[in-house]
């Protein structure tokens, strides 16, 4: 049988208390690939939310924010066609792939190939209208305000007053206009906006923990 909520809570809290105590011995996070003290605080904030200890959750979320050393991503950060959601420096904790990573060498079995619609390689992409696309539905899209820049990370329907807010990778802009359906994600960009070379474009980063989660 599964353990109780209380048992699991105590187990996780003990682990995180030890992490908070000993993580000072980790002097190199490998460019945020390994967690920092701020990440431990963030995990504790999540734990206390799960246990409905909201005062503690707030306390540790604030500690995470103060220790993070990063600010919430701006509109320019999020919509950049070269750095949009592929820059580990913007997050508290992430994974960084390089051209030497096994996942990148496969050409297709990697984050960008699965998540980025703006490539001509991988499982999603703009090679044709038959390709699968990561997207949201109209209901979710319509719930976002037209002044909320997060909405600009999804392709606006034809004739929309905010269509000009969508920023495409220039080398494949025509393909995006031709094949990409409305509400398709523009969020995760290939590295440096390289949409055609999998060895370069897939050498990207993806987030594990963001400071925005703490607000």
Regions found by a protein language model. Name each.
Residues 19, 26, 64, 70-72:
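Alpha-helical solenoid scaffolds that mediate protein-protein interactions
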Residues 1-30:
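Aromatic-anchored glycine-rich loop motif in surface-exposed flexible loops
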Residues 70-215:
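Elongated scaffold/linker segments in the mid-to-C-terminal portions of large proteins
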């Amino acid at each position: 049988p599964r353990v109780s909520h209380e048992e699991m809570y105590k187990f996780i809290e003990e682990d995180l208390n030890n992490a908070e105590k000993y993580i000072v011995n980790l002097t190199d996070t490998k460019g945020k690939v390994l967690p920092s003290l701020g990440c431990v605080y963030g995990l504790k904030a999540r734990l206390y939310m799960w246990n409905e200890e909201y005062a503690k959750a707030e306390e540790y979320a604030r500690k995470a924010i103060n220790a993070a050393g990063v600010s919430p991503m701006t509109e320019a950060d999020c919509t950049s066609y070269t750095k949009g959601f592929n820059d580990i420096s913007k997050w508290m904790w992430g994974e960084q792939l390089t051209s030497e990573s096994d996942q990148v060498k496969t050409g297709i079995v990697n984050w960008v190939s699965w998540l980025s619609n703006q490539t001509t390689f991988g499982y999603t992409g703009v090679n044709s209208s038959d390709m699968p696309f990561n997207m949201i539905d109209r209901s979710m899209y319509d719930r976002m305000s037209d002044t909320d820049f997060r909405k600009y990370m999804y392709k606006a329907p034809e004739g929309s007053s905010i269509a000009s807010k969508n920023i495409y990778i220039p080398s494949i802009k025509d393909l995006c206009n031709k094949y990409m359906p409305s509400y398709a994600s523009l969020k995760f960009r290939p590295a440096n906006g390289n949409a055609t070379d999998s060895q370069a474009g897939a050498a990207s980063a993806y987030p594990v923990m963001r400071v925005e989660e703490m607000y």
